[in-house]
Amino acid sequence: GAAGGAGGIGGDGGTLTAGGIGGAGGAGGNAGLLFGSGGSGGAGGFGFADGGQGGPGGNAGTVFGSGGAGGNGGVGQGFAGGIGGAGGTPGLIGNGGNGGNGGASAVTGGNGGIGGTGVLIGNGGNGGSGGIGAGKAGVGGVSGLLLGLDGFNAPASTSPLHTLQQNVLNVVNEPFQTLTGRPLIGNGANGTPGTGADGGAGGWLFGNGGNGGSG
C-alpha cells in the first residue's frame, strides 16, 4: 500500500549473457510511501569472463525504514568479479543499506558496493567488502544529520561538527563493544572475505549487521 510495506527482493542475475559476462542482479523494490524498508538487490550472475554486477537495494519509505542491501557481485572466472550493488536510501529515521560484496575472481576481484547515506537519524550503510582477488572495499555511507554513525569505509568528513559527533559516538560505543561485542549505535563489522566469517551484530539501539564474509 502507499503508507507502508517492505519492497520486494530483486531477482538474481542469470549465469551468462553475451560475451561470457554474468547477468546483473535485479534492483530491490522500493517500500511504501511513508513506512517500510527497501528490498535487497539480487546477486550478480557467474560469468566465464566477468561476473555480473549486484543489483542496488531499494529505497525505504520517506518517514521510517532502512534502505535495502545491495546484492553481491557475481564470480568472474576469466577476468573480473562483479561489482557489489549500492545500498538503498533510508527514510528520515532508518539506516542506509549496506553495499553488496564484490565478486571473487582469480584475476581481479570486484569492488564492493557503496553504502547508503543516512538522512536524519540513522547510520550510513557499510561499504561492501572487495571480492577475493584484490577487490577494493566500497565507500561507506555517511550517517544521518542528527544522530548516527558512518558506515564502514566512509570518507573522512570535512565538517568539524560531524567529526565531533562521530568521535563522541565512538567513545560511547567503546565500553559496549568491549563488554558485549556490539556497539550501542553503529553497524557491525563486515566478515573478512575468504573466511566465511559472520558479519558483526549491529548496535543495541540501531545499526545494520555487517556483511558476512565470502567462503
State where each predicted segment sits.
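Collagen triple-helix signature
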Residues: G1-A154, T163, I185-G215
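Extended, small-residue-rich solenoid/repeat segments and analogous flexible loops
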Residues: P155-G191
